[in-house]
Swiss-Prot record:
An annotated Gene Ontology molecular function: structural constituent of ribosome
SUPFAM superfamilies: L21p-like (SSF141091)
Keyword Nucleotide-binding: no
Statement: the UniProt record of this protein carries the keyword Ligase: no
Gene name per UniProt: rplU
Taxonomic classification: Bacteria, Bacillati, Bacillota, Bacilli, Lactobacillales
Source organism: Streptococcus mutans serotype c (strain ATCC 700610 / UA159)
NCBIfam families: L21
UniProt family annotation: Belongs to the bacterial ribosomal protein bL21 family.
Role according to the record: This protein binds to 23S rRNA in the presence of protein L20.
GO CC entries: cytoplasm; ribonucleoprotein complex; ribosome
Keywords attached to this entry: Ribonucleoprotein, Ribosomal protein, RNA-binding, rRNA-binding
Protein name in the entry: Large ribosomal subunit protein bL21
A biological process from GO: translation
Length: 104
């Protein structure tokens, strides 16, 4: 059974495994840099450890592969019979991280 972990980043919880690529909310680091996630909620495998609320001493290490923006989401509001309308687009920034190690 492979080791996995659940980490908290960007206000979300993400299940990760070694050599997995994940997309998280934008982190303030350059591409190629190493990033450490220390808010580990759960470490699973042969023996599962659940944190209260986080697992003490557990970290997940990854490498930032790239920074980018998601596809554009378009919102459109209008009020009938008033000639009022509004169109707005949004592209959410993200960081692609490849998980290298789970230290429990």
């Amino acid at each position: 059974m492979s080791t996995y972990a659940i980490i908290k980043t960007g206000g979300k919880q993400v299940k990760v495994e070694v050599d997995q690529a994940i997309y998280v909310e934008k982190l303030d680091v350059e591409a190629g840099a190493e990033v450490t996630f220390d808010q580990v909620v759960l470490v699973g495998g042969d023996k599962t450890v659940v944190g209260t609320p986080i697992v003490q001493g557990a970290t997940v290490v990854g490498t930032v592969e790239k920074q980018g923006k998601q596809k554009k989401v378009v919102t459109y509001k209008y009020k009938p019979k008033k000639g009022s309308h509004r169109k707005q687009g949004h592209r959410q920034p993200y960081t692609k991280v490849v998980i290298k190690a789970i230290n429990a």
